[in-house]
């Protein structure tokens, strides 16, 4: 899934 505040990274 995609997570992070301003950037999307794999969790």
UniProtKB/Swiss-Prot annotation:
Coiled-coil regions listed: none
Molecular function, one GO term: toxin activity
Keywords, comma-separated and alphabetical: Disulfide bond, Secreted, Toxin
Chief location category: secreted
GO CC field: extracellular region
Segments passing through the bilayer: none
Cystine pairings recorded for this chain: 2-11, 3-8
Tissue: Expressed by the venom duct.
Superkingdom of this protein's organism: Eukaryota
Protein name: Conotoxin ar5a
Species annotation: Conus araneosus
């Amino acid at each position: 899934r995609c997570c992070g505040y301003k950037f999307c990274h794999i969790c």
